[in-house]
């Protein structure tokens, strides 16, 4: 019996998606960009807060995924939100977001900032302009 086809991870990320994420991520204190084992990642103090990569899935087709970190009530809400969000199955606070034509880039900006704040040292988080939750 032949094995079921598996998804393949790729560097195939549209330039405009990578450009938008780069602008958001590099605006954060001490953030830097590097090529990951696949795709591109943005880090703070050697901790990845955003990673973007292509996924070629035999069932769902090719798409782009942004991985990020979340915490607390936001993490629980995202775990139950359904598409375009998905639990990655690794890391207690890791989530994925499929990026496509319907992506809300204001929401992506908020997710990027929150992901950064989950992983960055407190002194750097204090420098970030975060929206007032009230």
Regions found by a protein language model. Give the residues of each.
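Charge-dense, helix-prone N-terminal extensions
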Residues: 1-134
């Amino acid at each position: 019996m032949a094995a079921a086809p598996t998804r393949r991870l790729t560097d195939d990320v549209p330039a405009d998606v990578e450009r938008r994420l780069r602008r958001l991520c590099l605006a954060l204190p001490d953030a830097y960009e590097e090529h990951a084992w696949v795709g591109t990642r943005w880090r703070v103090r050697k901790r990845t807060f955003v990673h973007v990569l292509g996924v070629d899935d035999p069932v769902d087709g090719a798409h782009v995924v942004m991985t990020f970190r979340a915490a607390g009530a936001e993490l629980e809400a995202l775990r139950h939100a359904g598409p375009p969000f998905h639990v990655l199955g690794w890391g207690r606070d890791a989530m994925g977001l499929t990026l496509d034509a319907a992506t809300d880039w204001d929401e992506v900006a908020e997710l990027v900032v929150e992901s950064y704040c989950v992983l960055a040292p407190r002194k750097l988080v204090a420098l970030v302009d975060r929206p007032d939750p009230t």
